[in-house]
Amino acid sequence: GECIRHCPHHAKHTRRDFLSDLDRFEYTVALPAPSLYSQFNNVRDNDILLTALTLVGFDDVFEVSAGAEIVSELSRTYINEHPELHPLISTACPTIERLIRVRFPGLIPHLLPLLPPMEAAAILARRRAVEKTGLLEDKIGIVFLSPCPSKITFIHEPLGMGKSNIDAVLAIKDIYPVLLSHMKEAEQHPISHTLSGRIGKGWAISGGEAYGIISDHYLAADGIENVIRVLEDLEDEKFLPGLQFVELNACSAGCVGGVLTVENPYIAKAKVKQAFKYEPVLHMHCADLPEFRPEDFLWTQKVSYEPVYTLGANIFESMEKI
């Protein structure tokens, strides 16, 4: 999203869907990113915001932060079971994953082979919608509300899996004014949709994912320049003894700093931290999910090196292209 953020002529745009594009589905489920909550002022009851999504036109809502709590639990297990791969690197930010593929291939074995929270939430949301409605899966639209173009790119060109479980993507900045106009009505009769606590909602900010790992042996960095410096040091094996987990976010302050959000990222980060005092620690547990299988949330395809800096497969082919 840096090119969108810095282009002086505003010539760059994001490939995304709009509310009018969702008419092709018989039933739609909104997947609000954890960063959505911090875009609004004085909303202490998240159910007001989630109810507003149903007033906008969605049939149901499933929090991505609920998927994040499942991924946090699976991450803790994987980190504890694979000390030989420490430090493991988060794969929640698609920009980081792609950066490692093209520039730091030696770190690929350290990538945490888990689906990102939005995909985990999409799997769970679709199962619930099928059970609730009896509709075929292709009649149900799973719609992600995204804070950044990187996650949109992941949905169209996923890594670690063949096809995304998400059918459409709306930008938070597009849905924001529509939601704002429905907040007063939602406040009158909020419906309970909340499925997550601090651990899930904390993924919106830098350090939030590491908070869910429940370990002191982690490193968290945000901002693409800082991330590159950390990756260079990791490649040179310059890291703290006992380091288990590395959380990296391309956007400053974390996902709240995405180019498709509306609030100042540091104000949004402060809002997330303030909201923690009103939240339980955790809502979702793997053991509570019917027919839960950890392998459903693991990579199904390997992520491999992508040499974008070479002209050809060998030196002769490269010379011909010069």
Kindly give the residue locations of the regions a language model identified.
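Long, contiguous juxta-domain segments that are non-catalytic but functionally important
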Residues: 1-13, 17
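Iron-sulfur-associated redox domains of electron-transfer enzymes in respiratory
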Residues: 15-322
